[in-house]
Amino acid sequence: MCAKIALLLVLVGAASAAVLPDKFYGTFDLDHSENFDEYLTAKGYGWFTRKLVTFATFKKVFTKTSNKNLFDYSNLTSKKDVHYKNVQLGKAFQGEGLDSTKHEITFTLKDGHLFEHHKPLEGGDAKEETYEYLFDKEFLLVRMSFNGVEGRRFYKRLP
């Protein structure tokens, strides 16, 4: 009997962990960055590309769906928009990256932080990378790292 109760608690805990917390839902506009040019340099981007990326506008949008275990995500930029529909935490899917190539993408949740992992599926210069989303005061902070160089982008929630 104790084993059944323990199993039930594990299953309930796993099911509740599969839901994106409400704090992530909304539209977030890029406010400022820290160490982002250094991060892009570490990734091997040249001066011109770094300036294009640095001066582009970025918005992150997390939207609820009719299924509480799924969400929609949009990364809106002045160069290109990407939209992922019916995302399930922990389940990989194929989608287009900002570099216009196919990626295997997985969103996961750990200790209240959301992780977006991209694995490029086509040739080219794109490298595997992970973005970490967490809250820092009133900002949605997105952290990314390459070869020990961390870039941080701070997004402000729009009304």
UniProtKB/Swiss-Prot annotation:
Designated name of the protein: Fatty acid-binding protein homolog 1
Signal peptide feature range: 1-17
Free-text comment on this protein's domains from its UniProt entry: Forms a beta-barrel structure that accommodates hydrophobic ligands in its interior.
Tissues where this protein is expressed: First detected in hypodermal precursor cells at the time of gastrulation. From the two-fold stage through to three-fold stages, expression is localized exclusively to hyp-7 but disappears in newly hatched L1s and subsequent developmental stages. Expression from L1 to adult stages is found in a single neuron in the ventral cord with a process into the nerve ring.
Species name: Caenorhabditis elegans
PROSITE patterns registered for this protein in UniProt: FABP
Protein family (similarity comment): Belongs to the calycin superfamily. Fatty-acid binding protein (FABP) family.
Protein location: Secreted
Gene transcribed to yield this protein: lbp-1
Listed GO CC annotations: extracellular region
Listed GO MF terms: lipid binding
Function: May play a role in sequestering potentially toxic fatty acids and their peroxidation products, or it may be involved in the maintenance of the impermeable lipid layer of the eggshell.
Disulfide bridge map: none
Keywords: Lipid-binding, Secreted, Signal, Transport
